[in-house]
Design a protein with these regions (language model features):
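Conserved N-terminal catalytic/coupling substructures associated with nucleotide/phosphate chemistry
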Residues: 1-256
Length: 256
């Protein structure tokens, strides 16, 4: 067997160059992004979450928005990083094509019945998507214990939230396709463009492994907000949440 040469183009070349430089997609600076274009309501929401999580010092949370971003390591020199766009800009799509979530409800014969698009920064997208899925797309079974009303969804809320966070944090946003969520009466499928760490397989994900997020700056902000653990246990938590509520196991697929 002989050596082969492979020509890299487009996003594949970009990923290769970033790896050579020891950079990640979300750590690249954005020259034309100003503090004034970021969303104050999202900063308020983040401070609320981070205070509850106790994963940041109170003094850091009382700093102004620029100081807070510095504590989150969202500056590269004088420039804000792409992670700041995804986390705190009200319209990341001005800078990142396809940075939104698309939801569709399908009949079993694959006919699309209705659909929605969820835009905004990642904190906004996750909140809106969870609300849409649990109020419009998934039908809850209603039961009662004495006078208490209990809603049981086809997918446990904890598992759904963990899967959604995983998809948003680990997406390769150089891929211009949005995250897609396909819902039927019996299934829910989340698809995002992304890559496993080099040498990893689905078996790696299903076994004990360390945390290696594709977008570490984005992941750090969600960790500080108390939204994730950052211990590489997201997949384990999804499976456990499903088992605890008596649901069938989850299927994971990865296609390069």
């Amino acid at each position: 067997s002989g050596a082969t040469n492979q020509e890299l183009k487009g996003t594949a070349l970009d990923r290769f160059m970033l790896r050579r430089l020891g950079k990640t997609w979300d750590g690249v600076p954005v020259p034309h992004l100003s503090m004034n274009s970021l969303d104050n309501e999202t900063f308020t929401l983040f401070r609320k979450y981070a205070k509850l999580s106790q994963r940041m010092y109170e003094a850091d949370l009382q700093d102004d928005n620029k100081g807070l971003l510095e504590k989150l390591r969202l500056f590269e020199g004088a420039y804000l990083k792409r992670a700041a766009v995804m986390l705190f800009h009200s319209d990341p799509e001005k800078f990142v094509t396809g940075a939104y979530i698309k939801i569709g409800f399908f009949r079993e014969d694959a006919d699309l019945v209705y659909q929605d698009e969820v835009h905004g920064n990642l904190f906004q997208q996750i909140r809106k998507t969870m609300e849409l899925l649990t109020t419009k797309y998934m039908k809850a079974v209603i039961t009662y214990e004495d006078i208490q009303r209990i809603e049981t969804f086809p997918v446990p809320r904890e598992a759904l939230r963990e899967a959604l966070l995983n998809a948003c944090i680990n997406k390769d946003y150089a891929d211009t396709s949005p995250i897609q969520i396909r819902v039927t009466d019996t299934t829910l499928q989340i698809v995002n463009g992304g890559f496993l760490p080099e040498g990893w397989t689905i078996d790696t994900l299903l076994s004990s492994h360390r945390s290696m997020p594709y977008n570490p700056d984005i992941a750090n902000a969600f960790f500080r907000a108390g939204e994730i653990e950052a211990w590489g246990r997201g997949i384990e938590r999804i499976i456990k949440a499903c088992k605890n509520e008596g649901f069938s196991t989850v299927d994971f697929c990865y296609n390069e």
